[in-house]
Swiss-Prot record:
The gene is Dnaaf2. The keyword Transferase does not apply. It comes from Mus musculus (Mouse). GO terms for cellular component: ciliary basal body; cytoplasm; cytosol; dynein axonemal particle; extracellular region; Golgi apparatus; nucleolus; nucleoplasm. Keywords: Cytoplasm, Phosphoprotein. This is Protein kintoun. Residues 234-259, 357-490, 654-686 are annotated as: Disordered.
């Protein structure tokens, strides 16, 4: 704004390319430069200027106008600011052609004592722009009084104040600008800029003189410039009485400088991924406040103070005072200020306190509380602090809720013993944490419990084998009952909150919680932070949610307030790690309350390696010793690793040949042969144990265990796995019988026919019938070089898989 206002008039000059080229070539010609120099000297010659004024005076007299050139004589200079943007100078000058100041006695205004009322005639010239030494532009105005007025000003201080106030007021009223009267200062110089004569035009008493007889009329009428000339019969020649000069009033208040506030955001490409948790925050990272101080030479005279959402600036000589209310609370301890002397601007950069900014509830309109109170859509609950949070939503207030419930330390042993299974939702939300598939040894399937809170949407199949669990229709009916109770049905008084679908991502210094619940009411979102845990409760229009998070004792959270961002589809909460706990954590615990915490693992290399060791190293040994299989890596990409495993012949080939068909080393079985062999020789199919294909999805938490022929290639993709799944002897979840170790060894392994698989996307099918088979140790890996065909057998093999972004197109375009 300031730059646009101070721009030169040459910026409006519209020249074509041809005209620019002509000017360039002309000024490169020495003859043209000589002629141009002579022209400049001619128009600046005082004698030529005098002749020019005489000719203009004679021409205007012929048109009935008396023209007098007013040459300003130096007096004193006032320095101030123009519209709060750049400097301005007012030359208080004198000339004998201006009227003499006069006074008359009269009563004072407002009942004050009698005094003198002065009349100060003046002549005002248009402003002129000049460029300073550093390129900054300033404006100069000339206000011309009679020499007697300046003489009185030099001898009387109060008269001088009145004269200066009259000059400033004349410039403001005539040109429609705003001058800083409070900080107007008298300089030691007598004149600023190059003197330019002004013109006084007054109509002649007789009007336009008659045209001499015999002189032919002109071909063209007189132009109306610069104004309409008075008629000959006009008698309105009396001058109107001059308005009384302003009295010497009290010193005005300090000037409020112009300022602008810019919200600065940091662009991060990961906020523009194709994922629900990737969204730019509406709260800016910094506020940049630019304050225009055109009269301030040094910041030593200014005092700046920032408190919360208020910025205060005070200055003496020049007098500035600013009280600016900021849109967000800022961290004044990390702010910085810089003064640009060239532009006379103070730039203050203030980081936004994200925790304080996001804790403030949005200002509710007057209609919102009435609608919420009338409909009463929010379900009521009698569960402690959650009920208080729900009351805040119904009343539309932001009062703090009641006492927080205590959070106990997580007990991994208890989590294993209870064996509650809380699956993640079926949708793929791009998380990097998994929930362990806890199949404990000492707990029967009938003793395992699964609360309804494990199903946030009500459309996930039951994970327990009990026939009394809720079906999809029953869960849908339960949701309708919940909505009915929220509407105030007399049959129900309250409902219990449920655990929301939650995902947790981590980096070196923070945790990001993604709450996949649409329509969250921001005013009901409350959290309680502790070094080892975090409690959260919130509600929507028709349901309530509550959850408790715990972490290992060695993993501590920072006491800094969490960063919260609520959208229409979800909510994101960022928890900072304590400085001594920076790094990647292994596990976290989540549940409805501290009694129902369940362990969940983060996706990292340590957890993946541990799970592979559990899967590939079975605790039971096969009755018949098999030769270690050969593992061949077929394909290794950023997204998946494809492995082909072949079982070698047994060391006692006679035993297998007596049963029927032998296992051909290095030759995979066709589907027909595999089906025939499994139908005719169950023992042979038992000896050829199926190899499981483990798929690890980085976008979800489901496990896909796929059983098939040993010759089928096995794929290890980037999906998260369940490291806690114990590869115990097989058992059926419907049965609650507990077997001993000896009995487990004698259980016959069922034969999995072609096409059978247990899909990890449906946890109910996995847990209702969980089949775990003995897998021989994979001691060697046969790797084939795709270029020269050479084969290399590796016994100690380590694989590192690179990560890939979900939407690499954004990075390719960058």
């Amino acid at each position: 704004m300031a730059k646009a206002a101070a721009s030169s008039a040459l910026e409006d000059l519209d020249l074509s390319r041809e005209e620019v080229q002509r000017f360039t070539s002309a000024f490169q010609d020495p003859e043209f430069r000589r002629m141009f120099s002579e022209y400049a000297a001619e128009i600046t010659d005082p004698e030529n200027r005098r002749r020019y004024e005489e000719e203009i005076t004679a021409l205007e007299r012929e048109r009935g106008v008396d023209v007098r050139f007013v040459h300003p004589e130096p007096g004193h200079v006032l320095r101030t600011s123009l519209d709060g943007e750049h400097r301005c100078y007012v030359n208080v000058c004198s000339n004998s052609l201006v009227g003499v100041p006069s006074s008359r006695p009269g009563p004072g205004r407002g009942g004050t004592a009698a005094g003198s009322h002065w009349s100060l005639p003046y002549s005002l010239a248009p402003g002129r722009q000049y460029a300073g030494r550093n390129g900054a532009r300033y404006t100069v105005y000339d206000v011309v009084f009679h020499p007697e007025a300046l003489a009185l000003a030099r001898s009387h201080e109060r008269f001088r104040e009145m004269l200066d106030a009259t000059a400033l007021e004349a410039v403001e009223q005539q040109f429609g600008v705003r001058l800083d009267r409070r900080n107007a200062k008298t300089l030691k110089i007598k004149y600023k800029g190059m003197p330019e004569a002004a013109v006084l035009r007054t109509p002649l008493p007789g009007g336009v003189p008659a045209q001499p007889e015999g002189e032919p009329p002109g071909l063209f009428p007189d132009p109306p410039y610069p104004y309409r000339y008075p008629a000959a019969a006009a008698a309105n020649t009396a001058r109107s009485p001059a308005s009384p000069a302003p009295e010497a009033v009290q010193r005005p208040e300090p000037t409020e400088p112009r300022c602008s506030v810019v919200q600065r955001h940091h662009v991060d490409l990961q906020d523009y991924r194709c994922s629900r948790d990737a969204a730019p925050s509406t709260v800016p990272h910094e506020l940049v406040v630019t304050i225009e101080l055109p009269l301030l030479r040094s910041v030593e005279r200014a005092e700046l103070e920032v408190k919360g959402k208020l910025l205060c600036l005070d200055s003496r000589n020049p007098d500035y005072r600013l009280r600016l209310s900021l849109p967000y609370p800022v961290d004044d301890g990390r702010g910085k200020a810089q003064y640009n002397k060239a532009r006379r601007q103070l730039v203050v950069t203030l980081p936004v306190a994200l925790a304080d900014a996001r804790q403030e509830p949005p200002a509710a309109t007057p209609e919102e509380p009435a609608e919420e109170t009338g409909t009463d859509d929010v379900a009521r609950t009698s569960a402690g602090d959650f009920a208080a949070a729900r009351e805040e939503s119904a009343d539309g207030t932001g009062a703090d809720h009641g006492e927080k419930s205590g959070v106990g330390a997580p007990d991994p042993g208890a989590a294993h013993a209870e064996g509650e299974l809380v699956p993640e939702p079926e949708q793929d939300f791009g998380g990097d944490s998994v929930a362990p598939l806890d199949l404990g040894k000492g707990t029967s399937p009938g003793d395992r419990s699964l609360p309804y809170s494990a199903f946030p949407g009500g459309d996930t199949e039951s994970l327990c084998g009990d026939p009394g669990v809720q079906t999809n229709e029953e869960q849908e009916r339960t949701r309708h009952d919940t909505a009915g109770s929220a509407m105030g049905d007399p049959g129900t008084e309250s409902i219990a909150p449920v655990c929301p679908p939650l995902q947790c991502n981590q980096d070196e210094d923070s945790l990001t919680l993604l709450i996949q619940v649409p329509g969250i009411l921001p005013q009901t979102l409350h959290g309680h932070l502790s070094p080892v845990g975090y409690e959260l409760c919130f509600s929507t229009q028709d349901s309530g949610y509550s959850c408790t998070l715990q972490f290992a004792p060695e993993n501590k959270l920072s006491t800094r307030e969490p960063e919260t961002s609520v959208s229409l589809n979800n909510a994101v909460i960022v928890l900072a790690k304590s400085p001594e706990s920076h790094g990647l954590w292994r596990e976290w615990y989540c549940g409805l309350n501290k009694e129902s915490l369940e362990e969940r693992l983060f996706i990292n290399e340590e957890n993946v390696n541990g799970f592979l060791e559990e899967v590939l190293c079975s605790p039971l040994k096969q009755a018949r010793s098999l030769a270690p299989p050969l593992i061949e890596v077929l394909q290794a990409t950023d997204e998946q690793v494809q492995i082909h495993a072949e079982l070698q012949e047994c060391s006692d080939p006679a035993g297998l040949q007596g049963k029927g068909k032998g296992v051909r080393e290095g030759c995979p079985l066709s589907e027909a042969e595999a089906a025939d062999q499994s139908a005719t020789s169950p023992a042979a199919s038992d000896s050829a144990a199926a190899v499981e294909a483990l798929k690890i999805n980085t976008h979800g938490s489901a496990v896909d265990l796929q059983h098939g022929c040993p010759e089928v290639p096995h794929v290890l993709s980037g999906k998260p796995l369940q490291p806690e799944a114990k590869m115990d002897p097989e058992f059926i979840r419907e049965s609650s019988t507990t077997y001993s170790t000896e009995e487990k060894e004698n259980i016959r392994e069922p034969v999995i026919s072609k096409g059978e698989k247990i899909n990890g996307d449906h946890p109910s099918s996995l847990l209702n019938k969980t089949v775990v088979q003995n897998i021989p140790d994979f001691d060697t890996i046969k790797e084939t070089n795709m270029q020269d065909g050479s084969v290399q057998i590796i016994r100690d093999h380590t694989t590192h898989c690179a990560f890939s972004f979900q939407n690499p197109l954004l990075y390719d375009l960058d």
